[in-house]
């Protein structure tokens, strides 16, 4: 099984930013002067001691495999090529930022169902807009956002009120929060159980601490405690906000608030469910994920949904097609670039390295409205931007689910 996983992960399933460009290198293997439009070696991100995502180092070499060119998209994209100094076993490939006229923080969706305060966020209302999602797997091209299509003049958000309350409040409509996640793997046991810190980015390089999360050491499944107090990551801490828990296979993650399951007076609420598509047959490509959120009321408050005490939670509602109070999001389909031999997405300068973790969340009715985007900028630093209807806690938990190992998904 270990050899199978190594061979499968040797293929380039990473997602790069399409708005980046590098000086084209010459391959060390190719010595006839011909330029190559791909990574200089496979991305064996589970087999290198220098790999930024590696927790338990392992040794051995995996055979080099190639991914056939996909004819899915013919959209013009900018070229990305790796640095000649990169290790061929690293998952990440640094790229240089090009000046971008359309930045992520300047986009704002113009659809009434997302920016009109009187409209609730629910699939019943969203689906009435007649939007369609173009999936590259079906042979159709993915539509690209433009300044006219995605709007403009989003306000950059800031912390309002006590941090314990702000992190669970849905983002106001028309406000963009630009955050950074730092992974701390220093210390005796942080190689296995790193601590993740969420900061809200401010002007002039300043940042405001928001949340911290860490996987519990003694748990049958992946279980992350998320708190506003970075010094006490426990359920008993005053800063405890909620938790992220996975199933046995690591394919489904549940986000709960700080309530207790057995407390009938104040039951634990479902705040999100993250579902990763299984990949048992070993198909190559980036991860596919579905995110379920509680619906929004007309005054922009979340509908209370709880799976405690046998009630129908988010996942049960989704399985039974009862979507009246559930919002369903999907990762935006990356486009295969023949020239770089990789999948690309336009992160508008916020993501600078290729990674299988990079993603953007959209609703099928309007793929131009980026609800959340997450991606790598260095070995242990990631950017996380989110909008309405997400809150900081929900977005942070969704990002943490991307860090966790998924044997059946890769």
Curated annotation (Swiss-Prot):
Q: What is this protein called?
A: Protein king tubby 2
**Similarity-based family:** Belongs to the TUB family.
Task: Give the stretches traversing the membrane.
Answer: none
Composition bias of kind Basic and acidic residues appears in 132-143
What the entry lists under InterPro entries is as follows:
Tubby-like_C, Tubby_C, Tubby_C_CS
Organism of provenance: Aedes aegypti
- The segment annotated Disordered runs over 48-109, 121-159
Can you tell which superkingdom this protein's organism belongs to?
Eukaryota
GO cellular component entries = cilium; cytoplasm; nucleus
Q: Which residues fall in a compositionally biased region of kind Polar residues?
A: 48-72
Q: Known Pfam families for this protein?
A: Tub
GO terms classed as biological process: protein localization to cilium
Keywords (alphabetical) are: Cytoplasm, Nucleus
Q: Does the keyword Heme apply?
A: no
């Amino acid at each position: 099984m270990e050899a199978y996983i190594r061979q499968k992960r040797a293929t380039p399933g990473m997602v790069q930013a399409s708005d980046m460009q590098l000086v084209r290198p010459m391959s060390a293997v190719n010595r006839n002067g011909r330029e190559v439009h791909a990574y200089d070696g496979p991305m064996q991100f589970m087999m290198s001691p220098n790999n930024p995502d590696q927790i338990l180092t392992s040794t051995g070499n995996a055979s080099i495999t190639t991914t056939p060119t996909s004819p899915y998209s013919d959209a013009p994209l900018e070229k990305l090529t790796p640095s000649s100094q990169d290790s061929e076993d690293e998952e990440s490939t640094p790229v240089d930022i090009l000046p971008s006229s359309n930045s992520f923080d300047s986009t704002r969706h113009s659809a009434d169902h997302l920016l009109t305060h009187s409209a609730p966020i629910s699939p019943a209302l969203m689906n009435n807009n007649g939007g369609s999602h173009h999936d590259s797997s079906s042979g159709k091209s993915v539509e690209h956002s433009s300044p006219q299509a995605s709007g403009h003049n989003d306000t950059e958000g800031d912390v309002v009120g006590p941090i314990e309350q702000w992190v669970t409040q849905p983002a106001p409509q028309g406000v963009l929060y630009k955050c950074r996640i730092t992974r701390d793997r220093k210390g005796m046991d942080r190689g296995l159980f790193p601590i993740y810190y969420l900061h809200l980015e401010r002007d002039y390089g300043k940042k405001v601490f928001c949340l911290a999360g860490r996987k519990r050491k003694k748990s049958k499944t992946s279980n992350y405690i998320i708190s506003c107090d970075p010094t006490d990551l426990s359920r008993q801490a005053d800063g405890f906000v909620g938790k992220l828990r996975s199933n046995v296979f690591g394919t489904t993650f549940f986000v709960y608030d700080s309530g207790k399951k057995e407390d009938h007076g104040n039951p634990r609420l479902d705040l999100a469910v993250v579902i990763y598509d299984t990949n048992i047959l070993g198909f190559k490509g980036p991860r596919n994920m579905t995110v379920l959120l509680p619906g929004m009321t007309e005054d922009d408050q979340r509908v209370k949904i709880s799976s405690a005490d046998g009630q129908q939670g988010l996942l049960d509602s989704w399985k039974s097609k009862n979507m009246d109070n559930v919002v369903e999001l999907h990762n935006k389909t990356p486009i295969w670039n023949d020239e770089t031999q990789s999948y690309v997405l336009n992160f508008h300068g916020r993501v600078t390295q290729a990674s299988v973790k990079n993603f953007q969340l959209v609703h099928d009715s309007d793929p131009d409205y980026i609800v959340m985007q997450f991606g790598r900028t260095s070995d242990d630093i990631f950017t996380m931007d989110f909008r309405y209807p997400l809150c900081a806690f929900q977005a942070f938990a969704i990002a943490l689910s991307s860090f966790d190992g998924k044997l059946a998904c890769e």
